[in-house]
């Protein structure tokens, strides 16, 4: 829990008030109000088209809002506020021939990148510090990015994000297309870093069973915040039907379907 000695902005990682966003004349966010507490793993859930990624982009300053306000640790979204933020997207589509190595890619994340191409590998590795060990990618450093598996690539992107020493980590479907062992490893690493660094982690995911296991707080979005609270309070039949418009189970995995609503199928987990 946050110390009572901390200033109030430090206890709220993200505050959104009355956020409206329309894209191509279509209202996506319709007055979103939320406060995300600092130092927790929280999740945004909701059907396709509910505005989850749009809201995440607004947090990053990549999506202009029509009205309302967003503050990150008490500062309006902008250069100062975003210095504390790192982002892990869905898996990027890279050609297998993409030749930049993991080591070279991560060197770009450090502030000591001048002439990095000519530096010795051991010097680069030293500058990357403990992150390469913490994220379990030391054996991958010489591998081209284009040759990595989905799970390996997401661990590399996580390392890139953590090298910024963020206070807030935003994850947009970070394990989409990653196999079950890779997904498990990724979220175990997220949990370890959240606890070690006191990070605030905001996760967008369709995988409700994973959200139930890892999030301390859940926000169900469908244009507005339908409900929020602890997973056991939000992820019940009534609340999920309100968010998704159909009957879904909190123990199921929801894939992108390209339609307005997610289509559930069993994820194979029993709680």
Residue ranges, per PLM feature:
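Helix-to-loop junction immediately C-terminal to a conserved catalytic motif
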Residues: 60
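H-loop/switch region of ABC-family ATPase nucleotide-binding domains
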Residues: 205-206
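Conserved ABC ATPase signature
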Residues: 144-148
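Conserved ABC ATPase "signature" region
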Residues: 121-140
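Conserved ABC transporter NBD signature motif
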Residues: 68-81, 85
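Catalytic Walker B motif of ABC-type/P-loop ATPase nucleotide-binding domains
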Residues: 169-173
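The feature captures the beta-strand-to-loop junction immediately N-terminal to the Walker
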Residues: 45-47
């Amino acid at each position: 829990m946050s110390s009572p000695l901390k200033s109030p902005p430090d206890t709220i990682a993200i505050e959104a008030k009355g956020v409206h966003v329309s894209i191509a004349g279509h209202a996506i966010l319709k007055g979103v109000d939320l406060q995300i507490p600092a130092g927790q793993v929280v999740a945004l859930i909701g059907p396709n088209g509910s505005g989850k990624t749009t809201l995440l982009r607004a947090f990053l300053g990549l999506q202009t809002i029509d009205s309302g306000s967003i503050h990150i640790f008490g500062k309006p979204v902008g250069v100062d506020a975003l210095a504390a933020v790192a982002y892990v997207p869905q898996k990027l589509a890279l050609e297998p021939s993409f030749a930049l190595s993991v080591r070279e890619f991560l060197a770009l994340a450090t502030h000591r990148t001048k002439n990095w191409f000519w530096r010795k590998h051991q010097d680069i590795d030293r500058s990357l510090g403990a992150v390469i060990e913490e994220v379990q990618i030391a054996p991958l450093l010489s591998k081209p990015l284009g040759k990595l598996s989905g799970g390996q690539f997401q661990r590399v992107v996580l390392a890139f994000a953590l090298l910024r020493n963020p206070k807030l980590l935003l994850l947009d479907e970070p394990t989409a297309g990653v196999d079950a062992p890779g997904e498990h490893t990724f979220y175990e690493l997220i949990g370890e870093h959240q606890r070690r660094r006191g990070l605030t982690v905001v996760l967008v995911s369709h995988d409700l069973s994973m959200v139930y296991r890892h999030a301390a707080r859940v926000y169900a979005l469908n244009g507005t915040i339908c409900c929020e609270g602890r997973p056991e309070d939000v992820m019940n039949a009534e609340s999920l039907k309100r968010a998704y418009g159909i009957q879904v189970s909190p123990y199921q995995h929801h894939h992108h379907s390209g339609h307005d609503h997610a289509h559930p199928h069993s994820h194979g987990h029993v709680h």
